[in-house]
Regions:
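Pre-Walker A (pre-P-loop) alpha-helix and adjacent loop at the N terminus of AAA/AAA+ ATPase modules
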Residues: 53-96
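C-terminal alpha-helical "lid" subdomain
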Residues: 2-53, 57, 238, 243-250, ...
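Conserved catalytic/switch belt of AAA+ P-loop NTPases
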Residues: 168-200, 213-217
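Flexible beta-alpha connector loops of hexameric P-loop NTPases
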Residues: 135-146, 169-180, 225-227
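Walker A/P-loop
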Residues: 89-128, 152-155, 222
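A short helix-turn-beta junction within AAA+ P-loop NTPase domains corresponding to the substrate/partner-engaging
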Residues: 213-229
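Short glycine-rich substrate-engagement loop in P-loop NTPases that contacts/grips substrate
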Residues: 127-157
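Conserved nucleotide-sensing/catalytic segment adjacent to the nucleotide-binding pocket
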Residues: 154-174
Length: 324
């Protein structure tokens, strides 16, 4: 069961940031990785055995080959650890606190949910739920309030994963800011409740790197780092088609051509804050509303046919972020 904090989001002042998440990003078999791999090489993962079900779930995600490989490493470590324990060999406990870096709409929250359930199934976590928070949920208004709020969210995350979005914002106010108290409380909980919950700090790549550099004691506490690269244009078109299909809509070839132009323009305009699949979702939702208006205008007293009810035409992409 997922818990989500309901409170106003905080934003970095240097860039205009989108303010909504997308948690479901699907893939097709031809998806390609968006950027060269760095710390973890893509590999062919097994499609049989105990891993098969997790592989099937990861296969539904577009791209993210580097991330998927790292998820498999975690699984392999735990699986072999169980084998070592059964053989009477030493099987030391591992730390699974993580850093997720990347732009919005690249699947960070979705992967966090999968990891929470994976760690529960392997005996690391007792519940496997995900609790999402941000700065406004953790930081209070007076001395002591922040620690109280932060401890309450940690309590809710026990047995699962605490996912702190835009974690870098906790350090934006300097030494006197209450965000530092939230960081200190999180670090203390990592020590006091070792192996009782997993902490994931997530945010934009550059901001997260600066955040870790400004807190010398933090990097060593997060041995697992995942970078979520922006999707390629082709991958975003695949995501759009799959999102539409899930809702029983069809994007016509001309519609896909126009959408591709929109994606390219948006990516060029927002080099450091492109919202990836979130942008696709927002465009699709606006197009569906436009289609509904168009059909009512065309059939004031009749009923459109089945195909007409499904088709999203190029003109349905009008009035979407300045596009006509």
């Amino acid at each position: 069961m997922n818990e989500r904090a309901r409170s106003p989001e905080t934003r970095d002042s240097a860039l205009s940031r989108p303010d909504r998440r997308i948690n479901v990003v699907l893939r097709s078999a031809s998806a390609e990785q968006a950027a060269p791999l760095s710390s973890v090489r893509a590999r062919t993962l097994p499609s049989e055995g105990p891993w098969a079900e997790w592989q099937k779930e990861l296969d539904r995600l577009v791209g993210l080959e580097e991330v998927k490989a790292l998820v498999y490493e975690i699984y392999a470590l735990l699986q072999v650890g169980q084998m070592r324990a059964a053989a009477g060999l030493s099987n030391s406990q591992h730390v699974f606190h993580m850093i997720f870096k990347g732009n919005p709409g690249t699947g960070k929250t979705t992967v966090a949910r999968i990891l929470a359930r994976l760690l529960q199934s392997m005996g690391v976590l007792s519940k496997g739920h995900l609790v999402e928070v941000e700065r406004a949920d953790l930081v209070g208004e007076y001395i002591g309030h922040t620690a109280q709020k932060t401890r309450e969210w940690i309590r809710k995350a026990m047995g699962g994963v605490l996912f702190v979005d835009e974690a870098y914002s906790l350090a934006r106010g300097g030494e006197k800011d209450f965000g530092k108290e939230a960081i200190d409380t999180l670090v203390k909980a990592m020590e006091d409740h070792r192996n009782q919950f997993v902490l994931i700090l997530a945010g934009y790549t550059l901001e997260m790197e600066a955040f870790l550099l400004s807190n010398p004691g933090l990097p060593s506490r997060f041995p697992i780092r995942m970078t979520f690269h922006d999707y390629t244009t082709d991958q975003l078109i695949q995501i759009a088609e799959l999102m539409a299909r899930e809702r029983d809509y069809t994007l016509l070839p001309q519609t896909l051509q126009k959408l591709r132009q929109m994606v390219i323009a948006e990516k060029n305009a927002r080099l450091y804050s492109f919202s990836n699949a979130r942008f696709i979702r927002n465009v699709l939702e606006r197009a569906i509303r436009n289609q509904a208006v168009r059909l009512l205008e065309q059939y004031p007293s009749g009923t459109p046919g089945r195909m007409e009810l499904m088709d999203i035409r190029p003109e349905d992409l009008r009035n979407v972020d300045g596009w006509e």
